[in-house]
UniProtKB/Swiss-Prot annotation:
Ribonucleoprotein among keywords: no
UniProt KW keywords: Acetylation, Protein biosynthesis, Translation regulation
Record-linked PANTHER family: EUKARYOTIC TRANSLATION INITIATION FACTOR SUI1
Family: Belongs to the SUI1 family.
Entry keyword annotation includes tRNA-binding: no
InterPro entries: SUI1, SUI1_dom_sf, SUI1_euk
Name of the protein this chain belongs to: Protein translation factor SUI1 homolog 2
Chain positions with N-acetylserine modification: S2
GO BP terms in the entry: regulation of translation
Gene Ontology cellular component list: cytosol; nucleus
Role played: Probably involved in translation.
Length: 113
């Protein structure tokens, strides 16, 4: 007889490797950056989903200084703490969070218009 190697079918878990890589803290938690239209040309940018151990007031202070806009931290019952900034600052906030090392680029979701 010839030497044939026969593969025995076994159970395959396609998510086994993915789950092993995602063991880091907050890897699947997305940061949502939204813009809301106010009256006329005025708009409001909201940032939600940052880790709870971050100091929201310090992040807000740096964002306000960097983008020359006003802002506040709002406590929401469902969403937790949400950062609100005046104007459409979606791109600015996303690049700021990535450069500061607070969030990975893959974990940012930008919504609006």
């Amino acid at each position: 007889m010839s030497d044939l190697e026969v593969q025995v079918p076994t159970a395959f878990d396609p998510f086994a490797d993915a789950n092993a890589e995602d063991s880091g803290a907050g890897t699947k938690e997305y940061v949502h950056i939204r813009v809301q239209q106010r009256n006329g040309r005025k708009s409001l940018t909201t940032v939600q989903g940052l880790k709870k151990e971050y100091s929201y007031s310090k992040i807000l202070k740096d964002l306000k200084k960097e983008f020359c806009c006003n802002g506040t931290v709002v406590q929401d019952s469902e969403l937790g703490q949400v950062i609100q900034l005046q104007g459409d600052q979606r791109k600015n906030v996303s690049t700021f969070l990535v450069q500061a090392g607070l969030v990975k680029k893959d974990n940012i979701k930008i919504h609006g218009f």
